[in-house]
Amino acid sequence: MMGEQDLNPLGFHRHPPGRRMPSMMSPTAVLRDGAPELVLGSAGSNRIRSAILQTIIRVVDDGLQAGDAVDAPRVHFEDGIVYAEPGIDTVPLERAGRAIGRFRELNLFFGGVQAAARDSRGRLSGGGDPRRGGAALVVEA
């Protein structure tokens, strides 16, 4: 993390002494009636939050299994540019005058979400982000 430009703009080994190191890490648990419904985290610097939020929306609101939610195309807004993977409809954004940064394929730029979920029927699912070589496997006991 010391060399991470987003977290340490002064450069490697130049973090001010005595100051807490900033972090974008945000391990997340979504609970339903006090029990875990979805747990997830991601790599990806300042894109972590958008990757996690989009995965949560796809599982909780759209009802996708964790793997399908993790694999789904993502979008990220930064510095006035909307970055989008294939599968994101950018036409409304373009009509609104937004600058678009298009990617030709899924890309590690959009984070690396790892997720485990339990649906309303108690079925487990997992997702390991293909953008960063992730893998998930549900083992029935």
What do the predicted segments below correspond to?
Residues 1-104:
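Proteins synthesized as precursors that undergo proteolytic processing into mature forms
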